[in-house]
């Protein structure tokens, strides 16, 4: 469920349209299907579903991911009307080997400092950090934190996750291929200003790969950002940051 412009939006299946986007004003009469993005039935007679997901309000509109059957799972926008609910950007244009549209899988949608950030895979850079100003032209890759391809020719992924706004900047976890899994990154909204904040778990594991601190559960409290992490010394414990490398430290070794 998400509130946007005084109405409640959610995904539901009414038995006639599949799992689609619904809207409610809080009354029985005002609770209804907003739009069926993927109409029709499959070969078994079941309704197709667009599966709206990852909903967030941004600039008084609703943004979400869905699959309309033509573009794959991509980024959509709605102004609260059926006519105004449409594809915002098809980030992964090519089809797979079976002729079906590839999905970019937009995820982790969050507003920060007047922009919409999310993760997606455009088929070129792997799963990376994207940004949008709410327009098709202004929806683009922000930073490829792990460039290059693997031995099979597939793009490396940095897998940005745990996106959160703090003090006007975006904080998130990622693996840049150098510092390990789920270290803490920060972005000021520019490519140059998107970078590692701190590598909490230094060194390599027995396979020669960088240790990861596996940061999770980022939440702002009393003007600081708290999270869980494993620095390789204390185990998985509570950490805090004031947004600087020097101000990122262990709060308590509880066990």
Q: Language-model segments: which ranges?
A:
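Feature 14080 marks short, conserved micro-sites in well-ordered regions
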Residues: 1-255
